[in-house]
């Protein structure tokens, strides 16, 4: 959520920067609500001061019968204050809802562009495999090896659900453990295992609500939501808290299943594991000092990249332009892994700095010391990695001409020493 004072004092800048997203801000609506709120606050404070003055005068009168006019005046003022308080509450709720629907301002370092076509390639790592045969897409490999069953997954639930079998299930589990061990060991993240359902406040804190409710799986009876990413519960761990500045940065990692309707993806990636309603992901989340947040973003991005380097999977890093970054993000880098069976790079991680946007929504603050005024932290997150898409990358990059798949060396201890599937 953007700061009201910042918008008020930088109206043209806010409007200009948000237009680079392809969205905008209804400045007239903002001015109206902000002006109403400030006017009502002033009226309320004036009347409360008058009420306090009259009350003090009444307290000095020994014979209360001589103060009936003043008592009546105080009651009248109190009724007017009550009415103004109710009106102010309505205006503040309208202003808050308005602010909750306004996206974050892109960082000045974020490249300006209209769509993913304007994203900027930052670096490329690794060599694409040189295959002496026509590479197959992962869905064919998985079915041929009998480790992915798309037909039964659809039978159990519906489209975009998959049944992992045998070494396919073990490969998925091995990747989760490998990623968590790397991030908790070498990268010093604290592992969390959060609930897979969250309340409305949590979804609002990270920016999914109120704007994207139609994209979420909602459990109406209890007003809970299935999480679309571990970012939601893990970021909200510190919702409404004031952290110690000496403890920052706080670095958490979590494995969770993720649930997404994928409402806008009809007809896209209808085969395979790329776009599922349920998938597993290992997430990285940081709560950091505002002055260090972009240095911490570089570290988080490298932590996610290291998973691919250790698995020897070729990838590239792309910086998203203003027209392609997410609602809550100020700056985002995507890691895209090479998939020879599809002859393209596909996103496997998205690493973002939200600056104080989420912290302001979720009221996550810190104090430099005990006497300091609380400030909002900066929040960061990234996939470390999407597990199903890592399975895809292994199947396609390590496929052999005889139909088998070599298991990356770094993963073999997690696969009982097995060197290949098939």
Curated annotation (Swiss-Prot):
PROSITE patterns: AA_TRNA_LIGASE_II. It catalyses: tRNA(Ser) + L-serine + ATP = L-seryl-tRNA(Ser) + AMP + diphosphate + H(+); tRNA(Sec) + L-serine + ATP = L-seryl-tRNA(Sec) + AMP + diphosphate + H(+). Keywords: Aminoacyl-tRNA synthetase, ATP-binding, Cytoplasm, Ligase, Nucleotide-binding, Protein biosynthesis. Homodimer. The tRNA molecule binds across the dimer. Belongs to the class-II aminoacyl-tRNA synthetase family. Type-1 seryl-tRNA synthetase subfamily. PANTHER family: SERINE--TRNA LIGASE, SERYL-TRNA SYNTHETASE. Consists of two distinct domains, a catalytic core and a N-terminal extension that is involved in tRNA binding. This is Serine--tRNA ligase.
